[in-house]
Amino acid sequence: MEDRTRTYLKGRFGDYYARARMDTPPAANRREWGHIPWSAGSTTMVRHQSLLELGTLDDFLHRTAPKHVYFSAARFNDPGATTMDQKDWQSADLIFDLDADHLPGVNPDTTSYADMLTACKTELQTLLEFIDDDFNFDETQVVFSGGRGYHVHVRDEQVRSLDSAARREIVDYIRAIDLNIETLIETQSNHGTTQRILKHRGGWGQRIHKRLVELIETLQASDDTEALERLQSFEGIGTGRAETILGQIQNNPEAIHAGNLEAGGAGIRILADALAQTAFEAETAPIDEPVTTDTNRLIRLPGSLHGGSGLLVTPLDREEIPSFHPLEHAIADRFRGRDIQIRITDSGVTTFDGETFDITEGNKTVEECLGIFLMARGRAEKVTE
């Protein structure tokens, strides 16, 4: 990035912060604050600052116009101290991070930025199902990171005291790491006999049970030949076992709906095992483990600008998420309504503000919000007006 471009972006970020009013997180004065300046080649964070040392946050942001702004998930007794021991850790929000670069099926070299963001929002919906249905967290905040993904802040009191190991268990559960169907089965006594029942009132057991019931309903709607062929497509199920399973489905489907994995012999258990592996692969949320397990993590400030895109770090109400499109709705109004001149250095197809177009190298006059986006992403430089 050329000096002229860097100076321009810092100036315009400062103009944005001159009018913006930031909402601070709970217990803001007990959190560590950090920022990355617009210095040439700088990726080093200035940290170990308390809100008291910064002064008024809005004034600090206007004066320094940082490239990136962060605050700690943790709450400390002395957040401005230079060592973690001196800070005296008290608690920390539980943070989930989804980054498009880490999503299955996304290649940062070939997948467009717009497509990465779309894929990431799909994964966000999956993550929120875990947060709401499996963990029943109440105090949550969803934030578009301004870059390639989303953050979810969980501030329920019972999670703030969790150490890194406990947070890793949450990550492992969501990502189905080392998850075994045996942990989802309980033994029940029924008229003197024992039955192995799939727990299906929530969590992973419910996900597997749903797939099992859907398969059973598909087999019920098929003729016998099709149903037997479908059953034999599962490893470990031959002709005889397929016939036994189909007979159970036709004569006693209620037992399977109740989660009885011993109905009809070992066949239903084999089906459940196979469907569990499918669920573990398809229904996880690819959260970034180091972010969640780090109890001292610094995370982006909602309402601030992301120096790598010029987009807003945007807090979202749940009802806003389905219709939220970052490349339209995370554009700062401050950068709309005027044109600037830039020099395109990296040509190619670009999606921005509801339009997709092919930009070519050379000097261009564009709306400022697009110009800032391209410059921040390293695809353009500022030229003299």
UniProtKB/Swiss-Prot annotation:
InterPro entries: DNA_primase_S, DNA_primase_ssu_euk/arc, DNA_primase_ssu_PriS. One of its GO terms (molecular function) is DNA-directed RNA polymerase activity. It comes from the Archaea. One of its GO terms (biological process) is DNA replication, synthesis of primer. Keywords: DNA replication, DNA-directed RNA polymerase, Magnesium, Manganese, Metal-binding, Nucleotidyltransferase, Primosome, Transcription, Transferase. Its EC number is 2.7.7.-. Its cofactor is Mg(2+); Mn(2+). It is an enzyme of class 2 (transferase). GO terms for cellular component: DNA-directed RNA polymerase complex; primosome complex. CDD domains: AE_Prim_S. The active site is at residues 97, 99, 288. It holds the Pfam family DNA_primase_S. Belongs to the eukaryotic-type primase small subunit family. Heterodimer of a small subunit (PriS) and a large subunit (PriL). Catalytic subunit of DNA primase, an RNA polymerase that catalyzes the synthesis of short RNA molecules used as primers for DNA polymerase during DNA replication. The small subunit contains the primase catalytic core and has DNA synthesis activity on its own. Binding to the large subunit stabilizes and modulates the activity, increasing the rate of DNA synthesis while decreasing the length of the DNA fragments, and conferring RNA synthesis capability. The DNA polymerase activity may enable DNA primase to also catalyze primer extension after primer synthesis. May also play a role in DNA repair. This is DNA primase small subunit PriS. It comes from Haloquadratum walsbyi (strain DSM 16790 / HBSQ001). The gene is priS.
